[in-house]
Amino acid sequence: MNTYAKYNQSEQDYLESIFLLLKEKSIVHRIDVAKKMSVSQAAVNKAMKNLSEKGYIYEDGKHLYLTETGKKYAEEVYEKHCIIRDFLQKIGVSPAKAEDDACHMEHLVSHETVLAMKQFLKR
């Protein structure tokens, strides 16, 4: 969990969404991403073009897949999200609020802070 800081929030959100969709089902389409993120098809098309050019995703027909680099990055983002969510729940935040806050905080909290949260959760 070390590289997420150099990517922008939009990339993180799209890759995390694709990662989670792929965990749910083996075939993911652009429309699935649009629905999950509550964004337009045009926004997804633009993001997929950008992510493809950067080597994070590829498409086989109409199906989306993460490259090894994209998968590693998405896993790091998701791990950060889970650590923050779990930390917030541990200190008494409701599960729904912890999930919502983690979505926002994952883009702002430093690597050092996430590591400290992770260590705290191990106690």
Q: What is each stretch, according to the model?
A:
Residues 62-80:
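Basic, amphipathic "hinge/linker" alpha-helix immediately C-terminal to the N-terminal HTH DNA-binding motif
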Residues 42, 96:
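Key DNA-contact positions within bacterial/archaeal DNA-binding proteins
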Residues 76-91, 97, 101-104:
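Short, solvent-exposed amphipathic helices
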Residues 36, 73, 90:
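Residues within the alpha-helical elements of helix-turn-helix
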Residues 52-61:
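A short, conserved structural fragment
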Residues 2-39:
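N-terminal helix-turn-helix DNA-binding core of bacterial DNA-binding proteins
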Residues 100-123:
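C-terminal regulatory/oligomerization modules of transcriptional regulators
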Residues 14, 33, 44-52:
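Basic amphipathic alpha-helical segments that dock to polyanions
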